[in-house]
Amino acid sequence: MIRHIDLAVQNILEMKEKEPAKFKRLIDEGIMIGLGVDLEDGNKEVTTVDQIKNQNRPKDPEYASVAEAVIEGNNAETVKLISALLEKGKDPTDLVLNALMPGIQTVCELYDIGESYVPEILLANEALMKGVELCQKKKGEVPSQGKVVSLVIVGDLHDIGKNIVAAILRANGFEVIDLGRDVTVEAAVEAVKSTKANLVTGTTLMSTTKGGLKALANALEPEGVPLACGGAAVDRRFVDTFGNSVYGRTPLDAVKIAKEICEGKSWEEARNELY
């Protein structure tokens, strides 16, 4: 039995080198974690559900209750708790970043280890958006920090990550032009021209469509507008293979990149600042 496991691990390691796209897909689907194998770091213990929840749980008990409501996908409870905190005078942006976001972050990390599934992410995302809408309404009109076009690249219909990025950008004072999913390079460039956007954020969940991000970054270069790239199919090594682009691992990275670009820094400077 042990010999069979050793052979399986050897085959998996060979796959990592020879078929990185297939390896990445298996990692994303939680198959490796399900086997109890951590191939990123042989000395690292497999993260548990409790570790993830404890790491992301807000220290403030009221904020922790909001995060838990998001994790459970409980729209009514999320709205109730956020409304009460806003009435107490809590800052809307602080609520988004430190009460709502920890909830969705937890669900996404649980998904990464095979302890959460797409329906649960969808429910948590809906609860998150209900809370964000309340915070945006309370915050009202504020001076825009800049314009960001947000999209999922052509060929990909998965927009949960894009929606989260758009929500957190709006919560931080950016005007977001949301083009939706399955967006062509031509449509994205046209949107940049018509809106005079400062930045484009592009995501993809599938390795088969990530080449579209490279094409988009190249097409945006003559416009002087960089592309912030993210999503399950994308990593820093891939984004570093082409210019006019910055890799963001988390939604908060998108905010950092947007701030750098809207302050007048180049994509190279933004990339160096983030890395």
From Swiss-Prot:
GO cellular component: cytosol
Binding site for methylcob(III)alamin: 158
Residue intervals of the B12-binding N-terminal domain: 53-147
SMART domains referenced in this protein's UniProt entry, alphabetically: B12-binding_2
InterPro entries reported for this sequence: Cbl-bd_cap, Cobalamin-bd, Cobalamin-bd_sf, Met_Synthase/Corrinoid, Meth_synthase_dom
PROSITE patterns in UniProt: B12_BINDING, B12_BINDING_NTER
GO molecular function, one term: methylthiol:coenzyme M methyltransferase activity
Protein family (similarity comment): Belongs to the methylamine corrinoid protein family.
This protein's name: Methylated-thiol--corrinoid protein MtsB
Species the sequence originates in: Methanosarcina barkeri
Classification lineage: Archaea, Methanobacteriati, Methanobacteriota, Stenosarchaea group, Methanomicrobia
